[in-house]
A protein has these predicted regions:
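Extended, hydrophobic alpha-helical segments in both membrane/secreted and soluble proteins
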Residues: 262, 273, 279-286, 297-303, ...
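Active-site neighborhood of phospho(di)ester-bond hydrolases with catalytic His/Asp-centered motifs
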Residues: 46-52, 302-303, 323-325
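Short beta-alpha connecting loops at secondary-structure transitions
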Residues: 63-69, 298, 303, 332-343
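Active-site-adjacent C-terminal substructures of enzyme catalytic domains
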Residues: 306-344
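Glycine-enriched alpha-helix->loop->beta-strand junction motifs that scaffold or abut catalytic
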Residues: 236-240, 291-297, 314-323
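Divalent metal-binding segments
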Residues: 2, 7-18, 22-216, 222-224, ...
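Non-cysteine beta-strand/loop elements that form the S-adenosyl-L-methionine
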Residues: 55, 237-249, 320-330
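Extended hydrophobic/aromatic segments used for targeting, binding, or gating
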Residues: 210-242, 307-309, 313
Length: 344
């Protein structure tokens, strides 16, 4: 493959590539017979980009899901209209929505429920995911479908339609087969993204083998459960194991001693931890546990959505990384202004 007229450090050159090797760089190269030629017209030639925080299966599923939150949907009426329109296009099928966020503020009483979906949504099974990824909201037909799969649903779930990620009794019924990742991989490659870090907490050895089989030519680092260490001998130059993912929330935070032990065990495997931290409490507990365990240069914080100056200084002292999503400031500005305390 021959790249013509590319920008390399402010100089225009031609670059010849074969496989994963750069063979030649010169001001002018002549195309060989049968060689693919790409005319860059002065555009920069960059190494492949790496997405350091992605949920591959969830992102692939979202490509075929209905957007149920800002900026596409900005009110409950717009949500109802979108759900009914989607159901009309695919009658009798599940309507799967993602990205929902309460339009009046992210308090529990503002979140729609089963009754709202029954009254305002379509006459088919509906399942909507809160933007946090922690909550699914079902209508009655959706709950009936779960019952038919043998899920054990509490009275509270039947009343609200709310199923949180901690409701282990319904995880098997909610679980879907691995997604076809080919469309997502094509999209990533079209952006110049040639490698990703898969950050789903429940990633297991089985997930590792599935990614190994179905994600070429994408390079992948897969974080997840401690048991991923069993795949160390199956790691390749393209797919390898990464951090132990820690994923707790304010309502179910472990003790400092428990979290410290988890971090110590990850370090004993030669792995860092990647800790999901979107609240002040989650971040402070994580930093305290990393300090108690002894920080590793491999340790990192995911999101770091709320960081006080004190916490920032602590992160610097521990010399650990932060993988955040700066685009959230633009995409979620209104919600942040509404929901986050000003003194934070």
């Amino acid at each position: 493959m021959l790249f013509k007229k590319v920008d390399l450090e402010n100089n225009i050159h031609d670059v010849r590539v074969h496989g994963d090797r750069i063979l030649d760089i010169a001001p002018e190269l002549v195309a060989e017979e049968g060689e693919t030629v790409i005319h860059a017209n002065g555009g920069a030639l960059l190494p492949g980009l790496h997405d350091h925080h992605i949920h591959m299966n969830a992102t692939a599923a979202a490509l075929n899901s209905l957007s149920c939150g800002p900026p596409d949907v900005a009110s409950e009426q717009e949500l109802a209209d979108a759900l009914n329109k989607a159901a009309a296009q695919f009658p009798l099928q599940w309507v799967r929505g993602v990205g929902y966020y309460p339009f009046k503020g992210n308090e529990e009483h503002n979140i729609i429920d089963c009754d709202w979906l029954d009254k305002n949504g379509p006459d088919c099974p509906v399942r909507i995911q809160h933007r946090s990824g922690r909550l699914w909201i079902f209508n009655t037909k959706g709950l009936d479908a779960l019952n038919m799969k043998g899920a054990l649903l509490s009275d509270d779930i039947h009343r609200t339609g709310h199923i949180y990620d901690t409701d282990a009794s319904v995880q098997e019924a909610l679980a879907s087969d691995p997604q076809n990742l080919s469309d997502l991989i094509d999209i990533l490659l079209s952006y110049g993204i040639t490698g990703v870090t898969e950050v789903t907490p429940r990633n297991s050895p089985e997930d590792f083998l599935n990614y190994l089989k179905h994600t070429a030519p994408l390079k992948m680092t897969i974080m997840g459960r401690p048991t991923l260490i069993d795949m160390i001998d199956k790691s390749t130059a393209r797919v390898n194991i990464g951090h132990v993912k820690l994923h707790y929330h304010d309502h179910d935070l472990p003790s400092l001693e428990t979290l410290t032990k988890e971090i110590e065990e990850a370090h004993s495997q030669g792995r860092g931890v990647a800790s999901h931290c979107v609240t002040h409490a989650e971040l402070l507990l994580t930093l305290a546990a990393i300090e108690a365990a002894g920080p590793s240069i491999k340790d990192r914080i995911e999101h770091a959505a709320i960081v006080t100056q004190e916490a920032l200084d602590w992160i610097k002292q521990l010399n650990i990384g932060v993988v955040t999503q700066p685009s959230f400031i633009v995409a979620r500005d209104e919600a942040y202004q509404q929901d986050i305390e000003q003194n934070m």
